[in-house]
Amino acid sequence: MIQFLIAAPRSGSGKTTVICAVLTALQRRGAAPCAFKCGPDYIDPMFHRSALGVESHNLDLYLSSPDTVRTLYARYAAGHGAAVCEDAMGFYDGQGLTTRASAWELADTLALPVLLVVQPKGASITLAAELRGLLQFRTPSHIVGILLNDCSEALYKTLRPMLEAETGLPVVGYLSHLPGCAIESRHLGLKTAGEIVDLQQKLGQLADALVLDWAQLAALTDRPAPATPPLAAPCAPLARIAVARDEAFCFAYAETLDALRDAGAELVFFSPLRDAALPENIGGLYLPGGYPELYARQLSENCALRAAVQEAVQNGLPTAAECGGFLYLGQALDDTDGKVYPMAGVLPGSGHNAGRLVRFGYAAMTAKADSMLFRAGEALPIHEFHHWDSSENGTDFSVRKAEKRQWECGFATANLYAGFPHLYWAGTALPRRFVQAAQHFLKHKG
């Protein structure tokens, strides 16, 4: 099975463009690839799934233990002919100024070969010096080959023999310069696939422009498929849980949804933008993150759904709301033009544009008291990434970053979790507790 991680010395090297080209080319070759994203980013896996039709999952060594990451990788790689992981930031860049949760640590944990993407513009033999440093910085580096990005055929033919002689690494190919195929971004990263004009045409052009020695790549990256972990026998659904899913609420980890299903949840999806009512016979409500600020007017104009959510939560429906979902439960939300729109009105506080990233990055969140999802003193790794803030962020959890910065956040009761932190539910007790709360609610309602 072809298995490798695409990495780069730094952000902005074109990893996303390269992985789109590689995955499209693998599809054309009938390899049935799957994709993984190193780290907590929601948008790249969404892009892989919706744009390329490729199954894609997150692997994060801060949010998950090494054993959980190995299990998830084996589970989701099963049945595929190729597994391709995408780096985040630079190859060795992890939490703070360490390699923790870096792409290198992921490659080391999974014993994955690494294909290093290098942009040769503005340098020649200096590239070899940089590559030698990357090879020697940690042992083993797991780097097995080089792919030149944004590179002409002539430059590739010039640089390849020099780079191979200086580094001992094979240069397996190159991706030509295609300025018209750039993948646009917004304040939280890539635009979603549905927003990019002529996307399929661009992906085809990228695959056409990829020159790769496939036989050499296979020789460098072919590994035995990971042993598929045993899964519990599927049981009859224990409770129906409604999950918000549309353009405004699109940041839900696939692994979290599968963990809920594994715990006995029947997931039913609905749109806070379009549906007038919550799904019937539900015992729980999950409001993930996304872009509610881009759709504040439409969300507000759906008065029936806002009222239904308010009534359901106030009547004790077990509810989990992260980041954008948390903003939706507030009193009001500013859109990108600063206009204020009423929201569900379940929680105090209103959402506004802070004009910058707020409390960005990894942290550890500790519960102050028992609640639906947490037990007093229980700590969970979290991630935050948002430009909007709330006038009332809650005080039911203490949060601490590695550099010792601390703050309070979140609302937690017997039937509610709501806060800015994104939670990674796989490998935790959260799915089981949420399903149990949903069961209890259904048993005792009315």
Q: How would you describe each model-predicted region?
A:
Residues L5, V84-E86, L115-V117, L147, ...:
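Structural motif
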Residues L267, P292-D370:
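Cysteine-nucleophile active-site neighborhood
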Residues A107, P237, F249-A259, E266-V268, ...:
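C-terminal and late-domain segments of enzyme folds
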Residues I2-L110, V118-H142, D150, A154-K157:
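ATP-dependent carboxylate-amine ligase catalytic core
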Residues K37-C38, V171-P179, E266-R274:
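Beta-strand->loop->alpha-helix junctions that form or flank phosphate-binding loops
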Residues A193-P237, R245-F249, N415-G446:
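Acyltransferase
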Residues A239-Q314:
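Phosphate-binding active sites in nucleotide-utilizing proteins
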